[in-house]
Amino acid sequence: MLRRWAQTVEALGYDMLTISDHVVVTPDVAEQYPAPFYEPFTTLAWLAGVTERVALGTSVLIVPYRHPLLVARMAANLNQFSGGRLVLGVGVGWARQEFDALGVPFEQRGRLTDEHLGAMRTAWADEDDYQSGPIPIWVGGNTDLGMRRAVRLGDAWHPLRMTLPWLRSAVDRLKAIAQALERPVPALVPRIVLRLTDLPVTGPERRVGEGTIEQVLQDLEELRLLGSETVVLDPFDEDPAETLAPDRAWQALEIVADRWTWTNSTNQGEPQ
């Protein structure tokens, strides 16, 4: 299944393949994600061997779950062995039962994330030892705290599954936070749901990437206008069974790839 995912994504012309992160499939995790759940660094290392050009990313790695120097080492090795293809999307986590199972204090996950990211960057600065090369860090979190963390510690802000009005407002807040902290505005790299429908989806709760192919293409254009040069498409729509039978997801990715390429070729006069 993983090999087919990798080959499908690369053949369709996409630029990245991402994997999420859970160490223990506790009951709160199992409600959304089925077992087995693959460890991200091991899986991405294997995927590096069956792909040629796509970037390999986490969306997202739960930073407090692992010792930061171990993460720094694994990430550096993976980035080196894959030819510089690793992108590290990170988050603080949400599954309290999983934190309890790992013996990590849930209430301190934000502080731990900040400390761990700082330690990882310090480790990577030792180029003689880690030899990582540049590893982009995308900081997730649909909150002001997440935005502040992205401004202080990340290369990009990586919000997940949102509505367009919310994102427009959030981008303004992100810029204000960066200005207040006197730091550059991080890149905008959203992960959006991909759920194609035959009829238009309307209403204020419509998420970016949800609706007809025309709506999805318009959403991608709106994201471009907001400054996003990279968008992660997430065809998993909260039904664990879909991950075991991903034909619908592959079909949706193919439709978007075909139409997006055609649209850009028509508008710009050259294929993308």
Predicted regions and their residues:
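Active-site-adjacent structural elements that line small-molecule/cofactor binding pockets in enzymes
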Residues: M1-Q272
